[in-house]
């Protein structure tokens, strides 16, 4: 539905600019070439509403309707209750409310399509195979213990059967991916056969989209980085590139810098269209994501603090010089000595109250430099 695509594009623009201070590097206007695969670093769950408007406005997709890209999204977004498990910070009452909400049927209307895994399933999907079965017959002792601890903390009766935990209070655990070795349901063969069949169909659909000339946005890492590392890539990225045969690859990279006053600063680099790699596809895509991640002041300051050193203007200047030599995008706030001094003072002033963010930023900095 054309109108719905426009509404979502405008809504994401409004959200991203209210929640963040967004800085875009690279071309502000461009045309999405047919059969382009847009590869994006996955930093946070908010990545899509940050980059969506940049592509929507930059490629003028309200006008160039035929150029509208499709999105490959992890398949748990299509499961009812996804938003209840979206973040650990939600209260039990909010989880209960969101657990009833399902957006899966509407996602294809805005060109969002699932890409699943044959090797992973959600705890929720495992338990729904046999709702009346004892928890221990379906899940590992560790997961059962975690669910019982959650019940005790929430003042709920101790769960004994699968159906006891298929409710919103447990959503963040229910939407956790598990492998075959972590589950013990008697219907495991049926579950994993169905997962494999769905994953194969979803993969073929995405391949045909690109072959037919559509642009496709993918997050090669699959999920947001838990620790700041860029990579590893999810299984199947190389097969998707080989089978879909995109005409070009367009890298987008996102760097969040929370070591600022007020709203988090987000720097997004829009790269250049380039031919898809013919060899060592996963390695080439990973190197592309790392080398295109913007350098921020928060990364440099965090790396120094985590290593037990005191950040200095010289550290920032050295990082900027190295980024320039390697062609890595740089936050414009670091362009000159005055800007670097201001960012250094600001980051140091805010670092103590956001110390939990420091290891992530430091790891991101080192990972990007690894190339």
Show which residues each predicted segment covers.
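A short beta-turn/loop motif at secondary-structure boundaries
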Residues: 27-31, 258-261
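Residues that form or flank phosphate/diphosphate-binding pockets in enzymes
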Residues: 33, 46-49, 228
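A general structural motif
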Residues: 33-35, 66-68, 213-215, 246
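Non-catalytic C-terminal accessory region of glycerolipid acyltransferases
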Residues: 117-371
């Amino acid at each position: 539905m054309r109108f719905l695509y426009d509404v979502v594009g405008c809504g994401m623009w409004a959200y991203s600019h209210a929640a963040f201070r967004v800085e875009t590097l690279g071309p502000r206007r461009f045309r999405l070439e047919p059969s382009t695969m847009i590869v994006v670093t996955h930093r946070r769950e908010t990545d899509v509403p940050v980059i969506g408007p940049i592509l929507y406005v930059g490629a003028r997709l309200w006008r160039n309707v035929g150029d509208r890209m499709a999105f490959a999204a992890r398949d748990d977004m299509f499961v009812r209750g996804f938003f209840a498990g979206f973040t650990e910070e939600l209260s039990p009452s909010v989880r209960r409310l969101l657990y009833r909400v399902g957006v899966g049927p509407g996602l294809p209307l805005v060109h969002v399509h699932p890409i699943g895994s044959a090797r992973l399933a959600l705890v929720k999907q495992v338990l729904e195979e046999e709702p009346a079965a004892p928890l221990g017959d379906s899940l590992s002792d560790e997961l059962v213990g975690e669910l019982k601890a959650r019940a005790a903390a929430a003042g709920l009766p101790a769960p004994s059967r699968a159906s006891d935990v298929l409710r919103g209070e447990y959503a963040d655990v229910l939407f956790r991916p598990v492998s075959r070795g972590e589950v013990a349901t008697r219907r495991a063969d049926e579950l994993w056969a169905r997962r494999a069949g769905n994953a194969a169909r979803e993969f073929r659909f995405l391949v045909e989209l690109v072959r037919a000339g559509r642009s496709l946005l993918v997050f090669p890492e699959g999920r947001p980085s838990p620790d700041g590392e860029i990579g590893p890539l999810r299984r199947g990225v190389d097969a998707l590139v080989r089978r879909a045969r995109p005409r070009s690859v367009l890298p987008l990279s996102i760097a969040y810098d929370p070591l600022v006053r007020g709203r988090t600063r987000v720097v997004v680099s829009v790269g250049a269209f380039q031919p898809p790699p013919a060899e060592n596809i996963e390695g080439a895509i990973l190197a592309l994501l790392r080398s295109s991640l913007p350098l921020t002041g928060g990364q440099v300051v965090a790396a120094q603090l985590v290593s037990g050193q005191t950040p200095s203007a010289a550290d920032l200047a050295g990082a900027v010089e190295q980024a320039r030599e390697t062609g890595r995008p740089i936050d414009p706030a670091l362009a000159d000595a005055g800007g670097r001094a201001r960012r250094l003072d600001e980051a140091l002033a805010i670092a103590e109250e956001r110390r939990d963010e420091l290891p992530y930023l430091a790891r991101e900095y080192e990972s990007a430099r690894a190339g």
